[in-house]
UniProtKB/Swiss-Prot annotation:
Binds 1 [4Fe-4S] cluster per subunit. This is 3-isopropylmalate dehydratase large subunit. Catalyzes the isomerization between 2-isopropylmalate and 3-isopropylmalate, via the formation of 2-isopropylmaleate. The keyword rRNA-binding does not apply. It comes from the Bacteria. Heterodimer of LeuC and LeuD. HAMAP family: LeuC_type1. Keywords: 4Fe-4S, Amino-acid biosynthesis, Branched-chain amino acid biosynthesis, Iron, Iron-sulfur, Leucine biosynthesis, Lyase, Metal-binding. Its EC number is 4.2.1.33. One of its GO terms (molecular function) is 3-isopropylmalate dehydratase activity.
Length: 456
């Protein structure tokens, strides 16, 4: 019997254990940041343990960093977290992409950009959106702080192998419709728990035609569908992306092995979902989880349960309204879902020559220093600033209400991030998940519009 891509990578990393029971996996790459690592490092100190593989552990600063003045950290908690990671990196010999360095940025962007993320690896991070790296044909998943400490001490983790779910996506994406719309549509259609207990493998011609940026967007939000893992077969697009990256000096000797990473024709999946994107519309969420979304042309649904009622009450919306009726106040272009160069380029096409609507506060936060520098070389910062956007330093920013960048209470925000939970972007903030193009158009028009009619 053939094996799935996920099976192949998993089986190569099993050190001990039987199928159906917890198995001990070797971890190839451990990415850490300032929020979920301090307690784990302290655990090592208390037990007088060494960091098992400092050469496979890499740190960056992202969740709680300021995006206006990176060297004047006013928040005491943020300053403590940042300085603690800086000290831990020195004490334990960990390579850190520090504040102001050329590579610093959101952890799920730094890994791919530096070449640390590679096909066939097992990758963990104390962050729920670690599945992003699965776009390279890696098994990548988020872990808790106690597991972070376990990897620190042993470079292994006990995990139970999930079932395999194939999501076969075909058809040509219409103009103005993007990878973000694909994953939002899947979650809207099948729910926030359809992937629970599964590893999601995204396949099909649509996936093959996506850039690595688009593939990362889809895998990034696998967790929003309940899945711990999202994975895509590596191909020439993948290899070309990895080639020449600073930490990919093993490329020549590894690429032939990477070409063996695919699901066999006779591999058996536990479940298969098929999607034709030929008529897919731009997606907009109306509620308080990513499942609560609609096609742009559709009205918000009738109330079916208490969760819907609570969501409508929190969001200040009603059934039958449409996305264009939402009174927007903020637009956020950023996050590990959509703050890559291609996202900013797409948004800039819509913004160029226009002005941000007077009712809108709009900010752009490149996901990494690398993206920021590349965008500025292309003049994107000038385009956004001339239109009235704020152009910020890299970090997680307004994706989560942890750092200074927050949406005011009761204000609706068009956001390119991945979660629209209550309070996610700040106390009482009302988040609507959309593609970068939809967010950019909303900033200019002061409301959601059909981006298919304005994209160039």
């Amino acid at each position: 019997m053939g094996q799935t891509l996920f099976d192949k990578v998993w089986n190569r990393h099993v050190l001990y254990g039987k199928l159906g029971e917890p198995q001990l996996l070797y971890i190839d790459l451990h990415l850490i940041h300032e929020v979920t690592s301090p307690q784990a490092f302290e655990g090592l100190r208390l037990q007088n343990r060494k960091l098992r593989r400092p050469d496979l552990t890499f740190a960056t600063l992202d969740h709680n960093v300021p995006t206006i003045d990176i060297f004047n950290i006013k928040d005491e908690i943020a300053n403590k977290q940042i300085t603690t990671l800086q000290k831990n990196a020195i004490d334990f010999g960990v390579h850190i992409f520090d504040m102001g360095s050329d590579e610093q940025g959101i952890v799920h962007m730094v890994g791919p950009e530096t070449g640390l993320t590679q096909p066939g690896k097992t990758i963990v991070c104390g962050d729920s959106h670690t599945a992003t790296h699965g776009a390279f044909g890696a098994i990548a998943f988020g872990i808790g702080t106690s597991e972070v400490e376990h990897v620190f001490a042993t470079q292994t983790l006990w995990q139970t192998k999930p079932k395999n779910l194939k999501i076969d996506i075909n058809g040509t994406l219409p103009t103005g419709v993007y990878a973000k719309d694909i994953i939002l549509h899947l979650i809207k259609t099948y729910g926030v728990d359809f992937g629970t207990g599964y590893a999601l493998e995204f396949t099909g011609e649509t996936i093959k035609n996506l850039s690595m940026d688009g593939r990362m967007t889809i895998c990034n939000m696998a967790i929003e569908g309940g899945a711990k893992y999202g994975i895509i077969q590596p191909d020439d697009i993948t290899f070309e992306y990895v080639k020449g990256r600073p930490f990919a000096d093993n490329f020549v000797k590894s690429v032939d092995k990477w070409r063996e990473l695919y699901s066999d024709d006779d591999a058996i999946f536990d479940r298969v979902i098929e999607l034709d994107v030929s008529t897919l519309e731009p997606q907009v969420t109306w509620g308080t989880n990513p499942e609560m979304g609609v096609n742009f042309s559709e009205p918000f649904p009738e109330i079916s349960d208490i969760n819907d009622q609570r969501a409508y009450d929190y969001m200040g919306l009603e059934p039958g309204q449409k996305a264009e009726d939402i009174d927007l106040g903020y637009v956020f272009l950023g996050s590990c879902t959509n703050a890559r160069l291609s996202d900013l380029i797409e948004a800039s096409h819509i913004v160029k020559g226009n002005k941000v609507h007077p009712n809108i506060t709009a900010i752009v936060v490149p996901g990494s220093r690398t993206v920021k520098k590349e965008a500025e070389k292309l003049g994107l910062d000038t385009i956004f600033k001339n239109a009235g956007f704020e152009w910020r330093e890299p970090g997680c920013s307004m994706c989560l209400g942890m750092n200074p960048d927050q949406v005011p209470e009761g204000v609706h925000c068009a956001s390119t991030s991945n979660r629209n939970f209550e309070g996610r972007q700040g106390k009482g903030a009302r988040t609507h998940l959309v593609s970068p193009a939809m967010a950019a158009a909303a900033a200019i028009h002061g409301k959601f519009v059909d981006v298919r009619k304005v994209v160039v």
